[in-house]
Amino acid sequence: MPKHGKKYLAALAKVDRSRFYTPAEAIALVKETSYTKFDATVEAHLRLGIDPRHADQNIRTTVALPHGTGKTVRVLVFAQGEALQTALDAGADYAGSDDLIARIDRENFFDFDVAIATPDMMGKVGRIGRKLGPRGLMPNPKSGTVVQPADLARTIREVKGGRVEIRNDKTGILHVAIGKVSFTSQQLSENLAALMEAVKAAKPSGAKGTYIRSVTLTSTMGPGVPVDLVAVQNLKL
């Protein structure tokens, strides 16, 4: 069992593990128990009633957080022709075709957070899938990162503005950043509400029993705060 420092234990002592907090109480407690010197990330962890061994029960969708995550998102776009210029005009940090693919392959260049591609580029991008895939950077229609040129500018703006991918891990748990400790409680609440709506909308038809089984909020390195399931699922934007 890992040893925790005095600051963590002091923060943990403020959390009553025998109760479930309303979203407002949980957010306030997460802010109160954050002890890092930097502006910590606030994360929501959702345990779902899905069987990740079945492909049709895995969650992979996106949500546009109304207040973003507080993180600067670096976007790389695989495009050519007019679409390449569209990407640059829309604020892509990097855009290119064969040259960019070669750079990633040759230099192991991964100085970006999200990769987007137009459909005509996917055949070429597939050649570096072995490098992008394990890092979660491979463009995919399910995550909204393979888009037609006409939708490219909007997609880039959404990603930079706070659109995040929701994807369960191999144990059926979602880990999603919903902002920073410096955000107001209202901003965090609205981001959490948007996340809950997206997760409910993405419920697989094959999921049996209770779908959302637990929700926990935490800050970077901080203790988890259990949230009341009924209250959090009734959050409205």
UniProtKB/Swiss-Prot annotation:
Recorded hits in PROSITE patterns, A to Z, give: RIBOSOMAL_L1
Query: What molecular functions are annotated in GO for this chain?
Result: rRNA binding; structural constituent of ribosome; tRNA binding
Which GO CC annotations does the UniProt entry carry? Answer: large ribosomal subunit
- A Pfam family: Ribosomal_L1
Keywords for this protein: Repressor, Ribonucleoprotein, Ribosomal protein, RNA-binding, rRNA-binding, Translation regulation, tRNA-binding
Which InterPro entries does this entry report, sorted A to Z?
Answer: Ribosom_uL1_bac-type, Ribosomal_uL1, Ribosomal_uL1-like, Ribosomal_uL1/biogenesis, Ribosomal_uL1_3-a/b-sand, Ribosomal_uL1_CS
Q: Which domain of life is it from?
A: Bacteria
One biological process term in Gene Ontology = regulation of translation
| Sequence similarity | Belongs to the universal ribosomal protein uL1 family.
Task: Give the HAMAP family listed for this entry.
Answer: Ribosomal_uL1_B (MF_01318_B)
- Reported function: Binds directly to 23S rRNA. The L1 stalk is quite mobile in the ribosome, and is involved in E site tRNA release.
According to the record's subunit comment, the protein's assembly and interactions are: Part of the 50S ribosomal subunit.
**Record's protein name:** Large ribosomal subunit protein uL1
